[in-house]
Amino acid sequence: MELFWLEHKKLWRKKIVKICVLLCFVYCVIFGSILWFQWFGFGSSDDYTSAFGNNFDGYTVIKDSQEYALSFGGELTDETLQKIVSDYQQMEADGMEEELEKTDWQIVNSWLGTLYPELRDTSNYKTMISYVDPDKLTGFYERRQQVLDEFLEVSGQVGAEKEFLHQIERKVEKPFRYEWVEGWSTLLGSMVADLGVVMALFLGIVLSSLFAGEWHDNTSALVLTTRNGWGKIALAKILTGLAFTVEFFALLAVSNVISQLFFMGTAGWDMPIQNIKLIAVAPMNMLQAEIYEYAFVLLGAIGFAGIVMFISAAVKNNVLTLLLSLAVVYGPMMIAEYLPYKMQKALDLIPLVGSSTDIFRTNTFRIFGKLIWSPYLLITIPVLIGILCMPFAIKSWSRRMKA
């Protein structure tokens, strides 16, 4: 335990570590959460050409939007949808531009485009919500089921796979609860979902020197002469890397959640994620989806940390270690679109390469003839890969130290 605390303090004392943590905090929490809620994302529009033209009043806009959504009764039915669209059209006709900003018009417009494509007027430059006849917006859930079936057919997900996905979808409670959706859509679609991709960069910088730095700092001879030996020190380094990863994640996640609670409160936590993407099959509400996405980031970060520490133990050069570590995450992202679909899915199992937004999709894996919904594997396989790398990191470092 003493060795662990020594290694832990040694890591946190490094200037590069403090700089990385600070930069990531500023990017993910200050800009990606606080200023996004208050200014870039939800501030009232003053200049429609840029988010930077928004007013610094996001908190007020969010609260007004939540209050407005509650006026529609809390359940999403045909009548609710008709009333939302009718109310929007009336405000638009009255020239109430500022009032339109508190509506869920972007979300509702996506529903209309998905469920009522025959009502789209290609000659009209306006969005569907502005001109569609509210009285024709009927059969919401029947149409959703039809669209889902058509999507699965087009995707080649038929037979047993289609029935498997339908079994998952049947657990979704209907009618859907309805409150303000846009905030949760932004939160789950980018704020939390992109956290792991950003963390990977800074984790790579910090952990790449954990083992390789012993040669860079000319301390390898000192490690060989210590009474504890390489084995215990290697274990202490592994535990230090894991502890730093968890602490780093906790700092970002807790700060983001505090920001979220301040701006959004808990309103809408029990809405189904189908309000964001209608053809999603996951029986999850917004809170459950957020918990999954944070778990995805944490477990993916632990898995990535294991890979970085293995590379650091196997390579003496800090820069090469960093480049190889970053290539593990960003390399597959860059080449994925040029690969066959099955290979893309396989690459998604690499830590922090896949996306937590798979809960909105219908992807599956077939392993030994058994169908498995992709989010289950995306949250387990990456951390297992990292854990498996850790013993090899110790052995690799051992061989180099003895040599």
Where are these regions (language model features)?
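Residues that define the loop-to-transmembrane-helix transition and helix capping
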Residues: 18, 231, 318-320
